[in-house]
Regions:
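Class I (Rossmann-like) S-adenosyl-L-methionine-dependent methyltransferase catalytic domain
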Residues: 1-107, 123-138, 142-221
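A conserved beta-strand element that flanks and buttresses the S-adenosyl-L-methionine
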Residues: 115
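Short catalytic micro-motifs in class I SAM-dependent methyltransferases
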Residues: 118-122
Length: 221
């Protein structure tokens, strides 16, 4: 069953990305966050990030920040919003698709960095499982997966009562081959600022943002 994405129109993006009272991140927030992501990815890869896949990219706003940080990096965005693709697709290299269909829309990897920010908690379990497996085939470096869970206090159109616990997502990552590795070696760091916790998996080179361990499991530091 395909999700109805028609509500991701200009009014939606105006409210959550531009309205000063409702927007979830400012341009300064985005610079700090992507700066952290790119720096961490390059530390793990021991080389510059040259290609980025942004899944659920919306209007492709991360592409403008990436251009400031790494002018030569190749950006590919994927989003289900017909409005976003029509308005920004050609200018920002955005293709129409979703996490679940990314394997069928001609996206060619591997990518040094895969971004999936504030998307996974909106995706149905079957599509999520399928999409994570597809991301694994496109990953050629680091994947940054940002998820809001039932243990989070989040703003925006996030519905906490429909969210899963951190341990549920961890299990999905393991089954998709995105977290566990043959060496069993993990390095976890706590990021400074905004009270956000990040797990950096050294061997499989995945960064996940999940809240501290609470009911149902999660991340321990």
């Amino acid at each position: 069953m395909h999700r109805d994405l028609s509500h991701y129109d200009r009014r939606y993006f105006d409210k959550w990305y531009r309205h000063p009272r409702h927007r979830v991140k400012t341009k300064q927030d985005m610079r700090r966050q992507l700066g952290f992501i790119v720096a961490t990815a390059e530390y793990l890869l021991d080389r510059p990030v040259r290609s980025v896949l942004d899944v659920g990219c919306g209007e492709g706003n991360w592409s403008t920040v990436l251009k400031e940080l790494r002018p030569g990096a190749r950006y590919t965005g994927v989003d289900g919003s017909a409005y976003a693709v029509q308005r920004f697709g050609a200018r920002r290299n955005i293709r129409q698709g979703t996490l679940g269909t990314i394997g069928a829309i001609g996206v060619k990897g591997p990518f040094d960095l895969i971004l999936c920010l504030g998307v996974l908690n909106y995706v149905a379990p079957d599509e999520l499982r399928r999409g994570l497996r597809q991301l694994r085939t496109l990953a050629g470096g680091v994947a940054y997966l940002e998820i809001f869970t039932r243990a989070d206090e989040a703003t925006g159109d996030f519905r906490k009562q429909k969210a899963q616990w951190p341990s549920w997502y961890r299990a999905l990552f393991r089954r998709a081959g995105l977290e566990d590795n043959d060496h069993g070696t993990q390095v976890k760091r706590r990021a400074i600022g905004a009270g956000l916790n990040y797990s950096v998996d050294w061997e499989s080179r995945m960064i996940t943002r999940l809240p501290p361990n609470r009911r149902g499991g999660g991340v321990r530091y």
